[in-house]
A protein has these predicted regions:
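C-terminal regulatory/interaction module of P-loop NTP-utilizing enzymes
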Residues: 1-7, 11-384
């Protein structure tokens, strides 16, 4: 699997971070949206990619109990593209630098990104993309037995090498099954089970038979889509994780217009309709509307709608185009050239004879009007 040594920029703060893309993007891939990865091969002779001076299993900081600005474990949940990853970066940097959230919120975004990458390089932050590690499961995360060898997983290695200061494991885009990575070690996540606490707990690992503990200076920050994290699952981990909700912020788009389109009104209207049909978790974050560079911004908006938004709506509505048309306002548009999904009428005589009563005689079919995506009026008519 790959442990990310960089990060892909979250669109919700793309406008703030644009000026830093040239300096940070080259090292991290943030400018292109593509993570830079360092492949860690888990073998008995593997080379740990972080400095040797991080090895200090008996360092007193591992038992630190006085730092209270952040909980040991944080799960940031919210709808798609609401800035969860940005919040996770701010949290991780704040933990290491000892700055609370208010102080982090006034830090210039380029500085935060630069510090984040610095701490990844120094081995203070372990950035894990959950989809990458999920396929390897517990074996790649904690440990596995391969023949006569015991191979340490990425999380176990990182936890064992926490030394002075504070360390953060960043887990991006976890899903309902993510706790299976921890298995029996999940009990160690709880704050009062960490090293140096009155209820310090050690687990005997199944393959190595080693006593495994989690240091108190190790913090976990995870992000998840609110759609995949059901309340029942969150309730099962709320004793171990502080759950921080993140909501869409259309006010960020205040005053922003593209070809006469009010991005704030567009986002607000679509989200209200989505909430009506599907619930509050099914909303669009401001990141959808901040992906456009200043030049060619309308074309970028068109492509976001056609290539990202429409497929997402089709997934959420299980292909029910009629309800998607209501979300996009197609049902009330007067001009055919602004309708994204146009109804195709059945011609007379399509079938020979009358259809049986058991057939759906009210069925409708639609075609996607590609030209509508490149017409500013199509978007204005969604909310106007």
């Amino acid at each position: 699997f790959s442990a990310s040594a960089g990060f892909s920029g979250n669109s919700s703060f793309a406008s703030d971070a644009a000026s830093s893309a040239a300096t940070v993007g080259a090292a991290t891939g943030a400018g292109s949206g593509t993570p830079v990865t360092a492949t860690v091969s888990i073998t008995p002779d593997s080379v740990w990619p972080y400095p040797d001076n991080a090895i200090a299993s008996t360092h007193p900081d591992r038992k630190e109990q006085n730092f209270r600005l952040y909980p040991k474990n944080t799960l940031i949940k919210g709808p798609v593209k609401t800035g969860k990853f940005h919040q996770a970066i701010m949290t991780a940097v704040g933990i290491i630098e000892g700055k609370d959230s208010n102080m982090m919120n006034i830090e210039p975004v380029p500085d935060v990104l630069e510090h984040y990458q610095q701490y990844v390089d120094e081995g203070r932050i372990l950035h894990i993309s959950y989809p990458d590690i999920n396929s390897d499961g517990y074996d790649g995360f904690i440990e596995r037995k391969r023949g006569p060898f015991i191979e340490n997983g990425i999380f176990k290695q990182f936890a064992n090498k926490c030394a002075d200061g504070r360390y953060v494991v960043m887990m991006e885009e976890v899903d309902l099954n993510w706790m299976h990575l921890f298995r029996e070690t999940a009990v160690l996540l709880r704050e009062n089970r960490r090293e140096g606490t009155s209820s310090e707990t050690a687990i005997t690992l199944p393959f190595s038979k080693e006593k495994f503990r989690l240091p108190s200076n190790l913090y976990i920050v995870a992000t998840c889509d609110s759609i995949v994290c059901e309340d029942t699952i969150l309730g099962a981990i709320d004793h171990d994780f502080f759950i921080r909700p993140v909501s869409p912020e259309p006010e960020i788009l205040h005053g922003m217009r593209v070809e006469g389109i009010s991005l704030q009104r567009l986002m607000t209207t679509i989200n209200m309709r989505l909430s009506y049909f599907l619930g509050a978790d099914y909303q669009l974050g401001e990141g959808f509307f901040l992906q456009s560079p200043d030049k060619d911004s309308f074309i970028s908006l068109c492509r976001v709608f056609r290539e990202q938004l429409v497929p997402l709506l089709e997934k959420w509505f299980d292909g029910d185009i009629e309800r998607i048309r209501y979300v996009l306002g197609d049902n009330g548009k007067s001009r055919p050239d602004t309708i994204f999904f146009q109804e195709i009428p059945f011609r007379d005589g399509l079938f020979k004879g009358e259809l049986p009563d058991s057939f759906d005689k009210e069925r409708r079919i639609y075609r996607c009007n590609e030209d509508a995506f490149y017409n500013p009026k199509s978007y204005i008519d969604i909310y106007d």
